[in-house]
Regions:
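Extracellular/periplasmic, surface-exposed regions of secreted and cell-surface proteins
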Residues: 1-221
Length: 221
């Protein structure tokens, strides 16, 4: 990604916005950044008589945003379903319980939504008048502290659900889920006041959420 910009102040007339018709200071700047991602995945499905359903997935993802030995990671996921009403011993209940399916799943996926150089010490260039009031001097900031072993954040999701239909009219769907974010990229804690700079970001955090959903629908033909 490449960007360039330029600015000139004190435009003589807003009806003709050209650089030649501005008399103030002219400034310009730009930036250049890049990143790359690559991933492959495979999937296996199994269906036995529309009764037992299985699925397995496996991803292999890489990104340039992390150190060479930490940029690649495997992410698996699995799901299974059982259509209970397809069992022979459920035939007598189908007048009331038209359909019943029990399902479950677990999976993980990577998150690399961070800046490109989070693990690289960088120095920023700045113009300032804090040394000489009448002139802008160029100075570089000291490199920030970084975590050299930073890697993927991993999101794991566990879920169970039931889909049911009564009298071919009333639909019931229930879902329970747990979502865990492991190795969250956050600022380090517990550093003394004499550390001397901003705390580095690294895979120091974890987050867990749970919830459930219930949905009802009615269809009359």
């Amino acid at each position: 990604y490449v960007s360039h910009w330029a600015n000139k102040k004190d435009l003589l007339t807003p009806n003709n916005p050209q650089f030649d018709l501005a008399t103030g200071d002219q400034t310009s700047g730009g930036s250049h950044s890049w990143n790359s991602q690559f991933g492959v995945f495979g999937r296996i499905n199994y269906n036995y008589k529309e009764k037992y359903l299985l699925e397995a997935n496996l991803r292999y993802d890489g990104t340039s945003k992390f150190p060479t030995d930490l940029k690649w990671r495997w992410f698996p996921s699995f799901s299974a379903g059982w259509r209970v009403t397809e069992e022979p011993w459920m035939e007598g209940a189908k007048e009331v319980l038209s359909s019943l399916k029990v399902r479950g799943s677990w999976g993980s996926i990577g998150d690399q939504s961070v800046s490109n150089s989070l693990y690289i010490p960088t120095m920023s260039l700045t113009n300032s008048t804090w040394i000489h009031n009448d002139a802008k001097d160029v100075y570089y900031s000291t490199p920030a502290a970084v975590a050299s072993d930073i890697t993927w954040q991993e999101i794991q999701t566990l879920g169970f659900g039931i889909d049911a239909q009564l009298f071919n009219k009333i639909g019931i769907t229930f879902d329970w889920f747990e979502r865990k974010t492991k190795n969250m990229i956050v600022g380090a804690e517990g550093l003394g006041i004499g550390f001397g700079t901003t705390a580095p970001n690294g895979n120091y955090g974890d987050l867990s959420t749970r919830g459930w959903e219930l949905a009802l629908d009615y269809g009359h033909v």
